[in-house]
Amino acid sequence: MHALNIFPCGLFSYIALLCLEASIQEESSDLTGSDTLLWCNLDLDCLNNSSCCRSSSSSERPDFLNLESLVSFTFWEPLKFNNISSKNGINSLYSNSSSALITCSGAMVFLASLSAISEAIEDRIIMNSMPELMMISLASLVNIKSWSSISDIIFCTVAKIIQCFL
């Protein structure tokens, strides 16, 4: 049941990270250091450590188009964050290590099945990159207080995806 709950987050996180990576690549060609600022804000270990962001560089940035690093960032980082803070209802989802492992294992299988689909639409999404999808993704992983509000995230994200193709 836990794995099923995280599936929508996995889908939207994957699409959001594709869009974010495209946005980073576009901005880094014009503005030096903009990609460093964007990606260091995604590192949950660096939330309260400004020196971590200053020491980061684009060469150290995770490759979000790589499925393995994407799964690691999207699902294991919230688990590490949960060890520090149990606020915002995440602790109720990852109540123990076994449920966390079931969730992450199911999510990895789910994301692997999405890789073929994402390749088909990747070019179109990159042409219409929308960094705000990343905010929806982070809300689903960190800020969400009740899993009943996942429907709001679904509708909002679907609307943004439709905008890609208009």
Curated annotation (Swiss-Prot):
GO CC annotation, single: membrane
Membrane topology: Multi-pass membrane protein
Alphabetical keyword list: Membrane, Transmembrane, Transmembrane helix
Keyword Membrane (UniProt): yes
UniProt-annotated location(s): Membrane
Segments crossing the lipid bilayer: 4-24, 101-121, 146-166
Note: Partially overlaps NCB2.
Protein name as annotated: Putative uncharacterized protein YDR396W
